[in-house]
Regions:
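Transmembrane signal-anchor hairpin modules in multi-pass inner-membrane enzymes, especially those
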Residues: 1-92, 104, 113-127, 192-198, ...
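Membrane-interface micro-motifs in multi-pass membrane enzymes
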Residues: 37-46, 95-96, 167-182, 322, ...
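Membrane helix-loop boundary segments at the extracytoplasmic
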Residues: 31-41, 330-333, 364-403
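Membrane-interface helix caps and helix-loop-helix hairpins in membrane proteins
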Residues: 85-94, 212-213, 381-386
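Alpha-helical transmembrane segments of multi-pass inner-membrane proteins
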Residues: 27-32, 46-49, 77, 81-82, ...
Length: 426
């Protein structure tokens, strides 16, 4: 009879040999594998992994690896703290300050995912969990749609825009953003990794279906751009087929989804687009009034009315953030913080691009990071996805992974567990 340890022996064999490093790596792996299932569990495992890794650093003095983004990251954290300190209500910025701890994911990924095989196992676990979340979300869509057909048969589209599927995440934007990043990585895996089993195409179909049913246009845009990039990396000559496939897909889609796509060209008649235009105008006025440190993290909703034109009543909706990463950071934390964030994002992309050009095996990991970066950045023009912990955690993990395959191929794995340089197959 197969024991629990035998079942997970391939995973255990990838952990470091040093005691506290082994514990830290196992706990961090559990954190990564709960990103899509439970935010509370993922952050609890992350905290325990960071504690175990700190003990490992103190006892064993290992070499520490980190992506080359220290300067922009330090400046981003500094300006966030300064903006919070100088805000009209500093207490409202506590959440943004605490969220800076999530950047430890960059450190822990680079040092506790010890080999290309370890990374492959984590990614495959994430792909399966994404499919599970997709199945749950598809069931949620069926329940919601059936209810709306019974209660509001003439306004199904309208109510679907306000009652979307959240998967395990409690909110559709968190679910959609996570699925988008996993989708980009899974497409990279299928197109660019060697010897991939057909089973993973079924997984992709489930994930893609959940993204379509998520009904979120920014997520659709991010996925579309990621696919364009990855097909360009895989078979550039096939790019001309995309417009044809898009047209066929649009014509074959149910009327609800056709209407969702058409609404992009009708911003004044779509409440979610109309409120974004109002928010972006308000954000611009905030930046002009407070260019250096902004109005303060968590303070936008409190001062929102002050930046509307005289006598204008705000559109009813969610006003805690501005549905745009660039405007959000500029208005909330000031232009210096925004500049440091743009530097940080550019450094993450440039680092992945350089690794992409150096590595020969497991190149799909670097391409997944670049595709995920494009999807995340473009979706962030219509949603404040950098400010949502569930999506940010997945993004930081994705952007840390190219360093692992670079170290694996150059033989720079942890001394207590040399990283494998073999290609990752599936």
């Amino acid at each position: 009879m197969t024991s629990f340890r035998d079942l997970f022996k391939p995973a255990f064999s990838e952990l470091p040999t040093a005691t506290y490093a082994r514990w830290a790596s196992a706990l961090f792996s559990l954190s990564v594998l709960t990103f899509l299932l439970s935010l509370a569990a993922a952050q609890a495992f992350l905290a325990l992994a960071a504690l175990a890794y700190a003990v490992h650093l103190w006892r064993d003095r290992p070499a520490v690896h980190f992506p080359p983004i220290k300067a922009p990251l330090a400046l981003f954290c500094l300006f966030t703290l300064l903006s919070t300190w100088k805000a009209a209500n500093p207490g409202a910025g506590g959440f943004a300050v605490r969220k800076l701890v999530l950047f430890t994911i960059l450190l822990l990924t680079a040092n506790l995912v010890t080999s290309a095989r370890h990374l492959k196992l984590l990614w495959q676990g994430i792909f399966l969990e994404s499919a599970l979340a997709g199945l749950v979300a598809s069931g949620q869509f069926a329940v919601i749609y059936r209810h709306l057909r019974a209660v509001h048969p003439d306004r199904i589209y309208y109510y679907l825009t306000f009652e979307r599927i959240p998967g395990f995440m409690g909110h559709w934007m968190n679910f959609g953003g996570q699925q988008m990043l996993v989708f980009a990585a899974l497409v990279a895996f299928l197109l660019l990794a060697p010897r991939v089993k057909k089973f993973w195409w079924v997984v992709l179909a489930i994930v893609a279906l959940s993204i379509v049913l998520n009904f979120t246009r920014g997520v659709w845009l991010g996925c579309f751009v990621a696919v364009i990039y990855l097909i360009g990396c895989w078979r550039p000559r096939l790019l001309w087929l995309l417009p044809v496939l898009l047209l066929v897909g649009y014509l074959a889609a149910p009327s609800l989804f056709q209407q969702r796509l058409r609404s992009i060209g009708l911003p004044t008649s779509d409440p979610s687009l109309a409120i974004r235009f109002e928010m972006w105008q308000v954000g611009g006025r905030m930046v002009r009034a407070h260019p250096w440190l902004g109005v303060g993290p968590g303070n936008i909703e409190q001062v929102y009315l002050l930046y509307l034109p005289p006598g204008k009543v705000p559109i009813v909706g969610y006003h805690e953030h501005l549905h745009n990463n660039v405007l959000q950071l500029g208005a909330e934390r000031g232009l210096p913080c925004l500049a440091s964030w743009l530097w940080l994002m550019g450094a993450l992309a440039w680092h992945s691009w350089k690794i992409r050009r150096r590595i020969r095996q497991n190149r799909w990991v670097a391409e997944a990071a670049l595709a995920g970066w494009l999807a995340f950045f473009l979706e962030g023009l219509f949603e404040c996805n950098f400010g949502t912990s569930p999506v940010l955690m997945v993004f930081l993990f994705v952007m840390s992974t190219p360093l692992i395959v670079q170290r694996s191929e150059s033989g720079e794995g942890e001394a207590s567990h040399p990283a494998s340089s073999l290609p990752v197959s599936a």
